[in-house]
């Protein structure tokens, strides 16, 4: 009888240890892209390269009217608190003004994921706003600085 209890205790302890190791691995693998101090395309590219994150510049155009230009950087299949998503970083006049998490599964808790991720896309002294976009099968979440977003829309309204 004592042998059976001892055997079950050993199995329980091994299972508990494996579970703790799994939780530690799962939390460490949830490393997010953090943009504190990285607000220009060049500094974001350097940051992504240092972290061995594969990215591509998907749009680089200088608008001849006025003094504005847009650059977007895309990071595909990146693990976040919202699951594995694509991330689109949008710059206006070399300042990061918008970050979009794309193709978030309907299975995710959107309020938790959106508020948890918001911290990583804002400056240390202020919080970014966010908007959840429901496409039926999946979600996108936009994070943005209200002042910069208004400046972008004002520029677009003036020159379009």
From Swiss-Prot:
In Swiss-Prot or TrEMBL terms, this protein is called Uncharacterized protein YdcD
In this entry, which stretches build a coiled coil?
Answer: none
Q: Which organism is it from?
A: Escherichia coli (strain K12)
């Amino acid at each position: 009888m004592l042998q059976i209890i001892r055997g079950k205790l050993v199995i329980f302890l091994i299972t508990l240890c494996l579970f703790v190791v799994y939780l530690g691995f799962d939390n460490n693998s949830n490393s997010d892209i953090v943009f504190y101090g990285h607000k220009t395309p060049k500094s974001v590219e350097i940051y992504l390269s240092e972290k061995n994150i594969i990215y591509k510049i998907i749009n680089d155009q200088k608008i001849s009217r006025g003094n504005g230009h847009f650059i977007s950087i895309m990071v595909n299949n990146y693990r976040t608190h919202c699951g594995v998503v694509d991330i689109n970083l949008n710059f206006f006049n070399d300042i990061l003004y918008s970050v979009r998490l794309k193709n978030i599964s309907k299975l995710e808790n959107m309020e938790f994921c959106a508020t948890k991720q918001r911290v990583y896309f804002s400056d240390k002294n202020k919080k970014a706003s966010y908007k959840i976009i429901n496409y039926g099968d999946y979600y996108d979440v936009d994070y943005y600085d209200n002042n910069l977003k208004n400046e972008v829309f004002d520029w677009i309204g003036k020159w379009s």
